Amino acid sequence: MTKYVLDETGINVKHVKKIKSYPGGMEGFCKDLLDKKYDLIEPQMALGPRSSQEYAMYIKKARWPEQEPVIANHAVSWTMYSREILGTNNMTKAGRLQRDKMRKEVLKTVGLKLTAKMKKLPSW
């Protein structure tokens, strides 16, 4: 079921926080997602940075300003969000500077500072 949902929508349900507390659990969430009941799943998607980023990229296909501080707390999510939604080119130094500047501004709105540790992307 999760593989089918990922293929159909681009949403990885493993990234959704507290999915067991959703009415109907994971099955109910997947069913509502496939039935395009976005008003029901949006609060659940807003709980974590990865799910917020995926919701903005694959469902809204636009900026989600209310969730940008949550997304900005997670380096990988912000990198993908800024590339797809904000249009930064993360392959160039100028693009990365633009991405980090935008992230810094978003974090400032919630009273956080962008630290070197927060910038560090995992090395796979």
Task: Kindly label every feature range from the protein language model.
Residues M1-W124:
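Alpha-helical scaffold segments
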